[in-house]
Amino acid sequence: MRRSKAYGERYLASVQGSAPSPGKKLRGFYFAKLYYEAKEYDLAKKYVCTYLSVQERDPRAHRFLGLLYELEENTEKAVECYRRSLELNPPQKDLVLKIAELLCKNDVTDGRAKYWVERAAKLFPGSPAIYKLKEHLLDCEGEDGWNKLFDWIQSELYVRPDDVHMNIRLVELYRSNKRLKDAVARCHEAERNIALRSSLEWNSCVVQTLKEYLESLQCLESDKSDWRATNTDLLLAYANLMLLTLSTRDVQESRELLESFDSALQSAKSSLGGNDELSATFLEMKGHFYMHAGSLLLKMGQHGNNVQWQALSELAALCYVIAFQVPRPKIKLIKGEAGQNLLEMMACDRLSQSGHMLLNLSRGKQDFLKEVVETFANKSGQSVLYNALFSSQSSKDTSFLGSDDIGNIDVQEPELEDLARYDVGAIQAHNGSLQHLTWLGLQWNSLPALPGIRKWLKQLFHHLPQETSRLETNAPESICILDLEVFLLGVVYTSHLQLKEKCNSHHSSYQPLCLPLPVCKRLCTERQKSWWDAVCTLIHRKAVPGNSAELRLVVQHEINTLRAQEKHGLQPALLVHWAKCLQKMGRGLNSSYDQQEYIGRSVHYWKKVLPLLKIIKKNSIPEPIDPLFKHFHSVDIQASEIVEYEEDAHITFAILDAVHGNIEDAVTAFESIKSVVSYWNLALIFHRKAEDIENDAVFPEEQEECKNYLRKTRDYLIKIIDDSDSNLSVVKKLPVPLESVKEMLKSVMQELEDYSEGGPLYKNGSLRNADSEIKHSTPSPTKYSLSPSKSYKYSPKTPPRWAEDQNSLRKMICQEVKAITKLNSSKSASRHRWPTENYGPDSVPDGYQGSQTFHGAPLTVATTGPSVYYSQSPAYNSQYLLRPAANVTPTKGSSNTEFKSTKEGFSIAVSADGFKFGISEPGNQEKKSEKPLENDTGFQAQDISGQKNGRGVIFGQTSSTFTFADVAKSTSGEGFQFGKKDPNFKGFSGAGEKLFSSQCGKMANKANTSGDFEKDDDACKTEDSDDIHFEPVVQMPEKVELVTGEEGEKVLYSQGVKLFRFDAEISQWKERGLGNLKILKNEVNGKPRMLMRRDQVLKVCANHWITTTMNLKPLSGSDRAWMWLASDFSDGDAKLERLAAQFKTPELAEEFKQKFEECQRLLLDIPLQTPHKLVDTGRAAKLIQRAEEMKSGLKDFKTFLTNDQTKVTEEENKGSGTGAAGASDTTIKPNPENTGPTLEWDNYDLREDALDDNVSSSSVHDSPLASSPVRKNIFRFDESTTGFNFSFKSALSLSKSPAKLNQSGTSVGTDEESDVTQEEERDGQYFEPVVPLPDLVEVSSGEENEQVVFSHMAELYRYDKDVGQWKERGIGDIKILQNYDNKQVRIVMRRDQVLKLCANHRITPDMSLQNMKGTERVWVWTACDFADGERKVEHLAVRFKLQDVADSFKKIFDEAKTAQEKDSLITPHVSRSSTPRESPCGKIAVAVLEETTRERTDVIQGDDVADAASEVEVSSTSETTTKAVVSPPKFVFGSESVKRIFSSEKSNPFAFGNSSATGSLFGFSFNAPLKSNDSETSSVAQSGSESKVEPKKCELSKNSDIEQSSDSKVKNLSASFPMEESSINYTFKTPEKEPPLWHAEFTKEELVQKLSSTTKSADQLNGLLRETEATSAVLMEQIKLLKSEIRRLERNQEESAANVEHLKNVLLQFIFLKPGSERESLLPVINTMLQLSPEEKGKLAAVAQGLQETSIPKKK
């Protein structure tokens, strides 16, 4: 409150008495403020000066003192105080503006004023105050200043064209300097600016300027065209100004402006003539004048007291009638924004508003408009209207309103269809204003039809999708048309309820519920308007720089509410309203895709409503404080209405099932609901089924099925009529009028009569053949099609979206048909006509597009069938129940012609049961007449196959040529037709003999009894008349069903969550993915498991069983997350993981916990499949010990491979060997055309039961792709005291039978605990591919002719100049590549996984790498990059993980520039650190083995190396060329140990697979040149006969100490070489020491021979090294399999622990349950788990029945 002087003095006296002297001065600032409030400025100034004497640097005191000086008008001192305060506290921007204003007032010529104004302009750009100051300064400079002011305004307008004040000031400058033409020109330029057109000040300025221009002498002296154009602009400006004045000003100002508008119309009326722009504009402005007059009358009633609403509403109705009957302009001369006709938009707006107001005023009043016209459409009524609008002082005769002729108007009520069309045009005129959209929605809210909100939004947002797949997100990018439509429905709904509440309190019967748009108050809240404006700004990308982030937050905040996510705070009644409106709108749409989206969103809201309905039963829903949509208690859902709403929800769910094609589910759901709506839907479904069967009904069983469906349809229709008779209220629930139901019943009864004997569908006691008269696919126009207006309209269903854009193709087909018709003009008159219909002489109503079937579009059919164009039956108006997207629409006639091309859009008749290509069902074939019969009309199809099924069409049994000539001759009985009957249509007889011919290849005639389709790629080949033919690059395989592994499981729970896993290494949670967490129950064994896949990529991120030992624990700090411990298989192998799932709400988290515990309870009722023993035998420890022994053996094997002094001697093996692998031989089949080895592996099963199996095996040469049964086990372990023996064996049975394998001496393990028989626990199973892959197509990356000089993983960035920061471009391998031909070097980088280019440019001499500041691992350079396909200068930066890699990149980069200049190749980075190697092939295997045996290389240190000798059986064939099929080898751990592999004893050879020939090493053979008698090498020639190779011995020595292992047998895969003799000895012998080459003299022939021999030996040695390399890789694979076996054993132990827990729970249940059936139900589980004897089972059964007591020990 304001203080008085007395109060200040009292307070001052009290303080001065108690405070010391310095304290008094410090409190002076406060005293000064007290005196300032008391307006004692002198005392205030005194005390503030006292305060400043002790506190001189206080900016507040200086500012306060400046204010006091300003009040005294002491400008100089005030400026000085303000300046000092600004120095002490610079952020005070307002002081800069204050100083500039004071200086401009004091002395404009002072230079300081200009300085401070410029300084303020930088701080406040675009401020009107700055503009006034600058204008004041420039005005004082005279003409020069005026020019500067003009230039400055022009420059400012260039930056801010929407600035209203600047535009007005510029026009005023023109007017003040008498430059009226320039002022008018400026008004013309600004007319396109929407911001200016919506400004009242700007429109007032335009009207004044145009009026001055018209009154000026200059204008009168100019030509008449200029005057007429200016008059046109003036009338348009008046209309716009009138609209804005009605919205923002009072009644008096609106009256004055309307009178001025009247004068302008009267002035222009005298100059009318002709059909020019002025005449058209005048006529349109006349309509706007009367419309605004009616709005002004209602505004008078809104603001007046004691208003006679009846009189005002009648006069307003007269004005609206006149405005509505003014015709729309016929010329388009004035072009507005985006090419839209300005007059056209204004006319649509006028007709829309006037029409709606007429319906609004006449609602509930019969003949209201007729009475108004009769009463006031005359001279007396015109006088009453004039007096009501204008003052009595003005002359009536000189006004437009008083002299206009209104006596010839008619009573014309607006049609709803016309209003809907006008509304769409008016939307554009108002630029998507939310006030206008809400007003239109309110008008339609009281009409029987739904508002066309979808069309309005499509008009405003052309490219916005209709629905989003990401309903759970709130990202602004996911916004769609349905979101905006729901928003508008909500705004209209709440506005309507608010208006209704106001009208109930005080409302006259003549007062309209909703006033005209310019007059009515704001219909939406500020929060709703701000959200709508933010959405429009973001979608149209008109956001001010720096403001888009704020707009995104505004949009994002409300999307959750619109989608009813999380805590939406919506009233349940609004959710119900949304669900019902969306369902009703979706039902009236033509496209099945639109129906799915609308009804799907309706289902989404119903699912949100149902939980709220349960809460309503208990208590009411709390109302939020500031909701987006206000709650109205008048529409709160009552408990008595809950059942009805639940029923509506389930009906909507069933409708969605029908739309998606799940007809059976929909029928089941509808049958469970007893209401007329479900009866109606069931009647439609069954009638559609009957119609589908009727199309192809040939056999009696089909006829009977059709009759059954018709009977069901009849029964449901009768139920509807009966319920309606007993309760009239149910009629309102029907989606169609009751008359339509009766009409449909009558038609169904007629169809049932037709099926009776003697009916028109019968001929000679049986159903008429298709040759005779049948129903055409075009139904009667009176049949059943739903429309939103609840009346039957005949409108065929539109094709899917992907086919809706083929208008050009359809036009082309029409042109072809016209051309064919012209060719047929010389033929005789066609006998084709429409077949006789059973519908009677019903006429086709207007709007029925009979030619729609001719332009049929491809519909969605079964995924395994080919794409064919189908005719959509127009029997129903795309009713959601009648034609789901997954089914095919049949026509009412069987199809006779095979269509080959899908591009031509022809329709084909197909039953709903699908297609059968090239096959037929036995017993359903009927031979047809080969002679073509007469056709009635149009275009029909002829069955080429000659076979027809009752449910489908069989294609491709014979070959034929399809032409239009055949079409013209096709029969009427089996065909279908296009379009409606045209008496002038001559048909296609004899036309197009060779046009569009198709040649069909032969197909197999035999039926496939197994039910599989036999495909033939050459079944149909099209001969294109334009010689344009495209071969597919890759032949796509046959479509197969997608297998996810979840087929045999039932989904018990599914919810979207965010999954985390705990990383123990860094001790923190890591996000694993977003997706749906499912709990699946196996239908076979009943086990539940948890599965989760990531969204979009569908990668498994959780996959584990649910066990009884798992516990859910809440995550600390959150009530929406649970964590648990599980053995997870998401990465393929079992891994113990700590997982956590975060849910959206605590309710969802609690629901998950309940479902989880329910699954654990289910586990108690599941008996174990395989009881496991609970004794730990230490088997895992033994396995680990054997693995260590194997590593030790591999170390010796590595030493053997690296021996560079290998010598081979020729010795005979006299023993035939009966060891582990002695009975298993290797077959070698030489091939003259194949120089590589042809390998064949024996089958070696690893279990006794597999050895006894009688599955026969075949040679790989007989069946290269033959598959073998999947083995039940891979590993067998046996205990041994001497070591172990391992051999490579194939999983495929290729050449040996299991009977042979039984003769082998291989030791097979017999440990009981190793015999695991559960199929799901096998490792290494083999699966046949589900989809056969096409031939491999070479992928060209563009890097083929380039060497990789540098390659390393890095992160690439580019500099964005617009935002001034670095942006990440991708992570991947950055490469430096050099072209082999031109030596050019470039940098290429692709992103990981997606392989998208993110860098691609040449390295030029002027490029240089520079370090980024702050790090030495980042290099920066500038280049002309082509990563996006176009040349673009980019500033790039690459970051490496290690410093040495970054340095290497810099080094190679610099070398690349030098190499380009010298035209030389660069040494690749990867090979620089490598040293020259003698044997480049074998070292890789050594490195792998070295890594494997690194831990135990110190165990064996001797120099002994095992020698190997083996025996081989060679069988040669000379004709067939074969390919080897090698299956993955397996390990067999038998009864022998390391001694049998690497020992020097002869009795323990190295058994490694099959017996091997001399020259075969470790199972891979190499053949040395044959030894002749003189010990010289000779070549090997081919022999056509089979030959046995005798076993030989192979010796390997080191440092001349040769230890032989004569009995060592090796199973070998031998290379196929040509043979010359039937028995050949393969030997390698160490050559005797020869003198060096330079000590001996040789002839030329000897040198050539030795060179040839050396070359062959080197080639063979390289082959050996390559094979050893492959061997080492196989060994690594076996070690991997061993580890997998160990992991499997660990899993068994985990499951055993779970079994113990399960047994404990079962026994506890048994003990505490009462004797009887409950106990007996647990007996099988206990018997199985404990493996009780018969005697023990009997005792337990007695206990269960209560015959014997059991004692429970009690604790003491």
From Swiss-Prot:
Coiled coil: none annotated. One of its GO terms (cellular component) is nuclear pore. Gene3D superfamilies: Pleckstrin-homology domain (PH domain)/Phosphotyrosine-binding domain (PTB), Tetratricopeptide repeat domain. Residues 1587-1610 have a biased composition (Basic and acidic residues). Residues 1310-1322 have a biased composition (Acidic residues). Keywords: Phosphoprotein, Repeat, TPR repeat. InterPro entries: GCC2_Rab_bind (IPR032023), GRIP_dom (IPR000237), PH-like_dom_sf (IPR011993), Ran_bind_dom (IPR000156), RanBP1-like (IPR045255), TPR-like_helical_dom_sf (IPR011990), TPR_2 (IPR013105), TPR_rpt (IPR019734). This is RANBP2-like and GRIP domain-containing protein 2. It comes from Homo sapiens (Human). The lineage of its organism: Eukaryota, Metazoa, Chordata, Craniata, Vertebrata.
